[in-house]
UniProtKB/Swiss-Prot annotation:
GO terms for cellular component: cytoplasm; nucleus; perinuclear region of cytoplasm. Residues 9-24, 32-50, 510-521, 1083-1102 have a biased composition (Polar residues). GO terms for biological process: chromatin remodeling; circadian regulation of gene expression; entrainment of circadian clock by photoperiod; fatty acid metabolic process; gluconeogenesis; glycogen biosynthetic process; lactate biosynthetic process; negative regulation of circadian rhythm. A motif (Nuclear export signal 1) lies at residues 105-114. Residues 1-57, 467-563, 619-638, 675-708, 751-829, 950-971, 984-1035, 1057-1113, 1215-1248 are annotated as: Disordered. Residues 774-787 have a biased composition (Basic residues). This is Period circadian protein homolog 2. Homodimer. Component of the circadian core oscillator, which includes the CRY proteins, CLOCK or NPAS2, BMAL1 or BMAL2, CSNK1D and/or CSNK1E, TIMELESS, and the PER proteins. Interacts with CLOCK-BMAL1 (off DNA). Interacts with BMAL2. Interacts directly with PER1 and PER3, and through a C-terminal domain, with CRY1 and CRY2. Interacts (via PAS 2 domain) with TIMELESS. Interacts with NFIL3. Different large complexes have been identified with different repressive functions. The core of PER complexes is composed of at least PER1, PER2, PER3, CRY1, CRY2, CSNK1D and/or CSNK1E. It comes from Spalax judaei. A motif (Nuclear export signal 2) lies at residues 456-465.
Length: 1248
C-alpha cells in the first residue's frame, strides 16, 4: 500500500463511473501504482512486508469497473479492501492480462528513468513520481511548441515564403552534399516548420549515431533533442529569424564566419547507447529557410534546413592548440552568468544555455571561491580597466576541474556609475584529466547551492552596488569627459558626485580629451571645502534647480537665473544631488542642439513657458562657424555672439571651455595646465549669495597669489589634480547659482513683459532680453575680475563698498545708461581723462521712470550723474568727488596704461580728437552727496562730443571675420585670466592696455558707459540706481581681462556694430549701435538698473518699462546687483567698421616689425615654459597619440582657423601674427602676440 498511498491519483479521478474512456483512466492508474511497485520492488527494495503483492492486488482491483467505486467513501473502502479481504484477487484470464500490462509498465518506467536529468534525481535515485512529472512536462512542452509553430506559420508563412527558394527532396540532398561531404561529423536535415517532422536527413547520421537512417523517418526532430534544448531549438528556428538558403548557395563553400554568426548548440541522440542512460552528443547547428516539396505534385512547405556539426572535446584529437584555448564569459553583479563564449563549448563541455543564468561560484573549486570576492574588489577599483589575476579552477561538465588564467574587466553604467556586468577572459592553463569534457558528471551537485556560496554572492553583490571610484576606459566612463560633456552633468543623476567619481571622470578626461582636461584644470583651484559644500548643497538642491542651474551655467547669459525661478523647478526639495558628469553631459547635448542654427534655438523655446523670452541665445560650439564670417548686418548673428560671450564669462562653463571657444585656443589651453593660480570666481559666488559684503580685500589677496608661473610637468597627476579641483569648483558654483533660483520667481512676469515690450531691434536672435541675458556669467566673472585686477573695486555684491583710494590715471566716470536711474558717481574718482576715441554720448533722461525715446540719444554725448540719494537702498560708500565726471569714452592704449591726463596726446595720436580740459566741472542734474573735491578734477561742463550722429560709413557694414586685436588666442575667460595673471608680475601693461579697465571713461580700458545698465539684476530693480552703477566702471576695471577675452571671441562674430540693431553685441554697451550711432538706443544707454551686460548693452525700451514695473524689492536688488558687469568701450571699437575707425586710428605700424618683435618675445617666453622630461613625454604620447605625430587632435584639427585664418592643418596656431594690427590698436596687438606666443610655446615643446 505504500506505493499506492503515496502516488495514487486524486480520488475524484477514480470515482468516475466506467465509460468508454475508462481504459485510459485505468491505464493512468496502472502507471501510478505500477511505478510505485517498481520503485519499491526493483529499485528501493527497502519497504517492509509484501508491498509488491499489495500493489499487484491494488492494480487488479482498480482496473475492475465496479460500481462500488462511484464515491469517495467507496474509494476509501476500496483502498482498505485488499488488506481485509485478500481473497478478492482470483486467478483469471483478466488478471493475467493485467499482469502483462504491469510488466510493460515497469519496462516503460525504466525507459523513462534513462531520460530523467541527473539534477532531478533525489539522492541519486529516480523517483517514479519525478519520472512521470518530467514526462508529462516534456509532452506539454512539445505540444505547446507545435501549437506555437502552427500559429506562427499561419501568420508569417506568406511573407516569409515570398523570397524563399523551393526545392524537392532530391534537390535538397544535392545542394547540401557539397557542404557535408568533406566532414564526417556533419549532417544535414530538413525539418518542416509546419509539422515539425523530418522531411529529409542525410546519410551521415547512420555513422554519427550508429543507427539506421530509417530511425528518423516520419519522426519529429525535437524528439531526438535533449529536453532542455528543445526551447533553444525553437527560439533559433523562428521563421522570420532564419536566413534564406540563397545566402549560402551562392558561395563555393560554407564559411565558418557564417556558421558562427547564426549557429546554436543542441544535444542530439537517437537512442540509448548504454542500457542505463542515453548519451547525447553536442552539435553546432546552422539553420536556413527553404521550401521543400515532399512529394511530386504536393504543395511546398516551409522548412528549416539544418547543417549540424558534432563538437568534440578540445582536449581530444584533433586538439585545440593550447594558445587558442581562450574563451570569455560575462556575469552580472549577482554572480549569474550572462553570456558564455562559444569557444567555451569544447573546452568546458557546457553548452551556452547550460551556464547562462546559473551561479558562477557553483562552477568554481570550493577553495577558489573566496578569491572571487577579492577579484570583484579589484574590479571595482579598476573602474573598467582590465587586469590579470591569479588562476582559478573551473569545473568542466564531466566533473573535473580546469585551471584557468583569468583577466577581468567590467562595464560601468554611464549614469549610475555602477558596474553593469563583469567580463572575464580565460585561458586554459591545465586541462582535465578526463579529456572527454562532454561526459556526464558522476556526482552532479544538488540544485540548492551551498550556504557559503549564497553568502559570498551577497557580499559580492553588495560590493558591486557601490559607485565605481575610477572611470577607466569601460563603457561611458571615458565618454563623459570630453569637452562638450563636462559641465551639465552635475545635475541629473545619481548620488555619485563624490571625489572618487570625479577622479574617475578626471582620468577619463585626460585619456580622451587632453584639451578639455587641461582647460578644466584652470578651474581646479577651488579648495576642498568648497567641493564638500558643493556636494552637500547639491544633494539638498532640487532636481529642477539642478536642471536650471546647468542650464544657467550653460546659458550663463543671465537667462540662467531667471530659469531657476520657475515654481515647478523649486517643487522638489530633497532629491539626490546630480553628478558633475551628468550635468555636463546634458549641457553639451543641449548646447549642441541649440548651436545648430536659429531654428534649433527657437525649437528649444517650446520647452518653456511662453512668458519666458527664450531659454538662451545659445551658448554653443556651433558659433565657431559664425565667428569665422559673421554676417555683420544680421541681428541673429549678434545675438548669438552676445550669448556666446556671456557663456564664456561664466566660471561654471570652464569645464567645456574648449567646446565653447575657438579652435585656436587649444594650444593656449595646454600651456596652463600646470598653472596653480587660484580662481576667485567661487569666492565671488559666495559673496553674491551670502549677502552684500565688500570685496575690497579681494584684489589684494589675489595679488599675493600672483606669484610667477611654476614650472610643472604636464603629468597625469597634475592633470588629475586640476581636473578634480575643477569639478569640485563646478559643483560648488552650480549650487551657489541654484540657491539664487528662489529669488527669481517674482521676476518671471517681469521678464515676460520685458520680452514683449522689447524693441525688435534690441532683441537677440533667440528673442531673449539682452538686459538679463548677461547676468549669469558676467556676474561672477565680474567679481573674479575684481580680484584679478587690483585697480578695480567690485560692487557686484551690491553691498557697501569699502573706501579705496582712486587709481591714478583713471577717470572715474559715472555712466548712466538708464532713463529711470541716473548713474551715481564711481566709487573711486580718477584725476584726468586720457586721450580717447570720442564716442557719441546720449543725454540721460531724468530720474523719472518714463523711458526715454530711443531716438533722442543720438545727438549728444552727455553724462548725467545720479546723486547718491537716488539709490539709498544700496549701501554703497561713494568716495568723495568734486563733481561727477564726464563719461568720456576713451580707449586706453596698451602702451599707456593709466597715464595722467595729457591733452597733447590727444592731438599726437588722435588728430581729430578735441582737447579735453583737465576735467572741468560737469553740470549734472543732481550732484552726489558727500563728494569731496579732487584737486585734479576741474569742473566740466556737459559737453557734446563732435561725433556725427551717423558716421560716414555707418551704413557700410563689413563683416570683419577677425580683427587682429580681438582674435582669440585663448578665447575662454579662464585662459585669458590666467594669461593676465602670468603677465602681471612682468608688468600688467599689455594686459591692462588691451583689456578695458573701467574706472575711467577716457583713460580706463573699460570705458563702456552702460556698465551698470548692462547688468540686469536678478531681482526687480528699483527706480533708484543701484550701487552698482556708481562703481560700474570700477567693476569693469577688474573685468579687463575678461573684456579682452570677450572682444577676442567677439571679433569674428560681432558683425557690423553700425547696424544700429539691438543685436550688436558690443555697440549695445554704449547705448548706441556703434560709437553711439544706434538710433534705437535710449538716452545715455538705457536702464542702469537693468544691468544688462555692457558687452551687449542693448538696453531696450522694454528695459525701461521693466524698471517702471519693478520698484520695491531693494533688498533683493542689492542681492542681485552683485552680479552686475560692465563693459569696456573698446568692444564698441572692435565692432565698429574699419571705415568708421579710420577717423580715430593711430598711425599704423609695420607688420613685419610687429611680427619680428612678437617672435623675439616668444623666444624669451619659451624659456619660462615647462620642460617635459622623457618620462613625461612618454605619458603624453600614451594619453594623446597626436602628440607623437605632431598635429592637433582630429577633433579640432580644422582646415581653417576661424581666428588666424591659418589653412595649414596641424599648424600651431599663433593668433595675431598673421593679421595686420587693427587701426589704433597696435600695442594691443603686440600684447596679444606676446600672450599668444607664451601660450603656444609649451605646445611646441610637447609636440617635439
Amino acid at each position: 500500500m505504500n506505493g499506492y498511498v503515496e502516488f495514487s491519483p486524486s480520488p475524484t479521478k477514480e470515482s468516475v463511473e466506467p465509460q468508454p474512456s475508462q481504459a485510459v483512466l485505468q491505464e493512468d492508474v496502472d502507471m501510478s501504482s505500477g511505478s510505485s511497485g517498481h520503485e519499491n520492488c526493483s529499485m528501493g527494495r527497502d519497504s517492509q512486508g509484501s508491498d509488491c503483492d499489495d500493489n499487484g492486488k491494488e492494480l487488479r482491483m482498480l482496473v475492475e469497473p465496479s460500481d462500488t467505486h462511484s464515491s469517495p467513501d467507496a474509494f476509501r473502502l476500496m483502498m482498505t479492501e485488499p488488506q481485509h479481504n485478500p481473497s478478492t484477487s482470483g486467478c483469471s484470464s483478466e488478471q493475467s492480462a493485467k499482469a502483462n500490462a504491469h510488466k510493460e509498465l515497469i519496462r516503460t518506467l525504466r525507459e523513462l528513468k534513462v531520460h530523467l536529468p541527473a539534477d532531478k534525481k533525489a539522492k541519486g535515485k529516480a523517483s517514479t513520481l519525478a519520472i512521470l512529472k518530467y514526462a508529462l512536462r516534456s509532452v506539454k512542452q512539445v505540444k505547446a511548441n507545435e501549437e506555437y509553430y502552427q500559429l506562427l506559420m499561419s501568420s508569417e508563412s506568406q511573407p516569409c515564403s515570398m523570397d524563399v527558394p523551393s526545392y524537392t527532396v532530391e534537390q535538397v540532398e544535392g545542394i547540401t552534399s557539397e557542404y557535408i561531404v568533406k566532414n564526417a561529423d556533419m549532417f544535414a536535415v530538413a525539418v518542416s516548420l509546419v509539422s515539425g517532422k523530418i522531411l529529409y536527413i542525410s546519410n551521415q547520421v547512420a555513422s554519427i549515431f550508429h543507427c539506421k537512417k530509417d530511425a528518423f523517418s516520419d519522426a519529429k526532430f525535437v524528439e531526438f533533442l535533449a529536453p532542455h534544448d528543445v526551447s533553444v531549438f525553437h527560439s533559433y528556428t523562428t521563421p522570420y529569424k532564419l536566413p534564406p538558403w540563397s545566402m549560402c548557395c551562392g558561395v563555393d563553400s560554407f564559411t565558418q564566419e557564417c556558421m558562427e554568426e547564426k549557429s546554436f548548440f543542441c544535444r542530439v541522440s537517437v537512442g540509448k547507447h548504454h542500457e542505463s542512460e542515453i548519451r547525447y552528443q553536442p552539435f553546432r547547428m546552422t539553420p536556413y529557410l527553404v521550401k521543400v516539396q515532399e512529394q511530386q505534385g504536393a504543395e511546398s512547405q516551409l522548412c528549416c534546413l539544418l547543417l549540424a556539426e558534432r563538437i568534440h572535446s578540445g582536449y581530444e584529437a584533433p586538439r585545440i592548440p593550447p594558445e587558442k584555448r581562450i574563451f570569455t564569459t560575462t556575469h552580472i553583479p549577482n554572480c549569474l552568468f550572462q553570456d558564455v563564449d562559444e569557444r567555451a563549448v569544447p573546452l568546458l563541455g557546457y553548452l551556452p544555455q547550460d551556464l547562462i543564468e546559473t551561479p558562477v561560484l557553483v562552477q568554481l573549486h570550493p577553495s577558489d571561491r573566496p578569491l572571487m570576492l577579492a577579484i570583484h574588489k579589484k574590479i571595482l577599483q579598476a573602474g573598467g580597466q582590465p587586469f590579470d589575476y591569479s588562476p582559478i579552477r573551473f569545473r568542466a561538465r564531466n566533473g573535473e576541474y580546469i585551471t584557468l588564467d583569468t583577466s577581468w574587466s567590467s562595464f560601468i553604467n554611464p549614469w549610475s556609475r555602477k558596474i553593469s556586468f563583469i567580463i572575464g577572459r580565460h585561458k586554459v592553463r591545465v586541462g582535465p584529466l578526463n579529456e572527454d569534457v562532454f561526459a556526464a558528471s558522476p556526482c552532479p551537485e544538488g540544485k540548492t547551492p551551498h550556504p557559503s556560496i549564497q553568502e559570498l554572492t551577497e557580499q559580492i553583490h553588495r560590493l558591486l552596488m557601490q559607485p565605481v571610484p575610477h572611470s577607466g576606459s569601460s563603457g561611458y566612463g571615458s565618454l563623459g569627459s570630453n569637452g562638450s560633456h563636462e559641465h551639465l552633468m552635475s545635475q541629473t543623476s545619481s548620488s555619485d558626485s563624490n571625489g572618487h567619481e570625479e577622479s574617475r571622470w578626471r582620468k577619463s578626461g585626460i585619456s580622451k580629451n587632453g584639451s578639455k582636461t587641461q582647460t578644466r584644470s584652470h578651474f581646479s583651484h577651488e579648495s576642498g571645502e568648497q567641493k564638500e559644500i558643493a556636494v552637500t548643497e547639491m544633494q539638498s538642491s532640487t532636481p529642477a534647480q539642478a536642471k536650471a542651474a546647468p542650464t544657467v551655467e550653460r546659458d550663463s547669459s543671465g537667462s540662467s537665473l531667471p530659469k531657476a525661478s520657475f515654481p515647478e523647478e523649486l517643487a522638489y526639495k530633497n532629491q539626490p544631488a546630480c553628478s558633475y558628469q551628468q550635468i555636463s553631459c546634458l549641457d553639451s547635448v543641449i548646447r549642441y542642439l541649440e548651436s545648430c542654427n536659429e531654428a534649433a534655438t527657437l525649437k528649444r523655446k517650446c520647452e518653456f513657458p511662453a512668458n519666458i523670452p527664450s531659454r538662451k541665445a545659445t551658448v554653443s560650439p556651433g558659433l565657431h562657424a559664425e565667428e569665422a564670417a559673421p554676417p555683420p548686418s544680421k541681428v541673429s548673428s549678434h545675438a548669438e555672439v552676445r550669448a556666446r560671450l556671456s557663456s564664456l564669462t561664466l566660471p561654471d562653463k570652464a569645464e567645456s571651455v574648449v567646446s565653447l571657444t575657438s579652435q585656436c585656443s587649444y594650444s593656449s589651453t595646454i600651456v596652463h595646465v600646470g598653472d596653480k593660480k587660484p580662481q576667485p570666481e567661487l569666492e565671488t559666488v559666495e559673496d553674491a549669495v551670502s549677502g552684500p559684503e565688500s570685496l575690497d580685500g579681494a584684489p589684494g589677496g589675489l595679488s599675493q597669489e600672483k606669484g610667477p608661473l611654476q614650472k610643472l610637468g604636464l603629468t597625469k597627476e597634475v592633470l588629475a589634480a586640476h581636473t578634480q579641483r575643477e569639478e569640485q569648483g563646478f559643483l560648488q558654483r552650480f549650487r551657489e547659482v541654484s540657491r539664487l533660483g528662489a529669488l527669481q520667481a517674482h521676476r518671471q512676469n517681469y521678464r515676460a513683459q520685458a520680452s514683449e515690450r522689447a524693441a525688435p531691434g534690441l532683441r537677440n536672435a533667440s528673442g531673449m532680453d539682452s538686459s538679463w541675458k548677461k547676468t549669469g556669467k558676467n556676474r561672477k566673472l565680474k567679481s573674479k575680475r575684481v580680484k584679478t585686477r587690483d585697480s578695480s573695486e567690485s560692487t557686484g555684491s551690491g553691498g557697501p563698498v569699502s573706501h579705496r583710494p582712486p587709481l591714478v590715471g583713471l577717470n572715474a566716470t559715472a555712466w548712466s545708461p538708464s532713463d529711470t536711474s541716473q548713474s551715481s558717481c564711481p566709487s573711486a574718482p580718477f584725476p584726468a581723462p586720457v586721450p580717447a576715441y570720442p564716442l557719441p554720448v546720449f543725454e540721460a533722461p531724468g530720474i523719472t521712470s518714463t523711458p526715454a525715446p530711443p531716438e533722442a540719444a543720438h545727438s549728444s554725448f552727455t553724462v548725467p550723474v545720479v546723486p547718491m540719494g537716488a539709490q539709498p537702498d544700496f549701501a554703497v560708500q561713494p568716495l568723495p568727488l568734486a563733481a561727477p565726471l564726464a563719461p568720456v569714452l576713451a580707449f586706453m592704449l596698451p602702451s599707456y596704461p593709466f597715464p595722467p591726463a595729457n591733452p597733447n596726446l590727444s592731438h599726437a595720436f588722435f588728430p581729430g580728437q578735441p582737447h579735453f580740459p583737465a576735467q572741468p566741472t560737469f553740470a549734472s542734474e543732481m550732484t552726489p552727496a558727500s563728494q569731496a573735491d579732487f584737486p585734479s578734477q576741474t569742473p566740466l561742463l556737459r559737453q557734446q562730443c563732435t561725433c556725427p550722429v551717423t558716421p560716414p560709413a555707418a551704413t557700410v557694414t563689413s563683416g570683419r571675420a577677425s580683427p587682429p586685436l580681438f582674435q582669440s588666442r585663448g578665447s575662454s575667460p579662464l585662459q585669458l585670466n590666467l594669461l593676465q595673471l602670468e603677465e602681471a608680475p612682468e608688468g600688467s601693461t599689455g594686459a591692462a592696455g588691451t583689456s578695458g579697465t573701467t574706472g575711467t571713461a577716457a583713460a580706463g580700458l573699460d570705458c563702456t558707459p552702460g556698465t551698470s545698465r548692462d547688468r540686469q539684476p536678478k531681482a526687480p530693480s528699483t527706480c533708484k540706481e543701484p550701487s552698482d552703477t556708481q562703481n560700474s566702471d570700477a567693476l569693469s576695471t577688474s573685468s579687463d581681462l575678461l573684456n579682452l577675452l570677450l572682444a577676442e571671441d567677439l571679433c569674428s562674430a560681432t558683425g557690423s556694430a553700425l547696424s544700429g540693431s539691438g543685436a550688436s553685441a558690443t555697440s549695445d554697451s554704449l547705448g548706441s549701435g556703434s560709437l553711439g550711432c544706434d538710433a534705437s538706443r535710449s538716452g545715455a544707454g538705457s536702464s542702469d538698473t537693468s544691468h544688462t551686460s555692457k558687452y551687449f548693452g542693448s538696453i531696450d525700451s522694454s528695459e525701461n518699462n521693466h524698471k517702471a514695473k519693478v520698484s520695491t524689492d531693494t533688498e533683493e536688488s542689492e542681492q542681485f546687483i552683485k552680479y552686475v558687469l560692465q563693459d569696456p568701450i573698446w568692444l564698441l571699437v572692435a565692432n565698429t567698421d574699419d571705415s568708421v575707425m579710420m577717423t580715430y586710428q593711430l598711425p599704423s605700424r609695420d607688420l613685419e616689425s610687429v611680427l619680428r618683435e612678437g617672435r623675439e618675445r616668444l623666444k624669451l617666453l619659451q624659456r619660462a615654459q615647462p620642460r617635459f622630461t622623457e618620462g613625461q613625454r612618454r605619458e603624453l604620447r600614451e594619453v594623446h597619440p597626436w602628440v607623437q605625430t605632431g598635429g592637433l587632435p582630429a577633433a579640432i584639427d580644422v582646415a581653417e582657423c576661424v581666428y588666424c585664418k591659418s589653412e595649414r592643418k596641424g599648424d600651431i596656431c599663433l593668433p595675431y601674427e598673421e593679421d595686420s594690427p587693427s587701426p589704433g590698436l597696435c600695442d594691443t596687438s603686440e600684447a596679444k602676440e606676446e600672450e599668444g606666443e607664451q601660450l603656444t610655446g609649451p605646445r611646441i615643446e610637447a609636440q617635439t
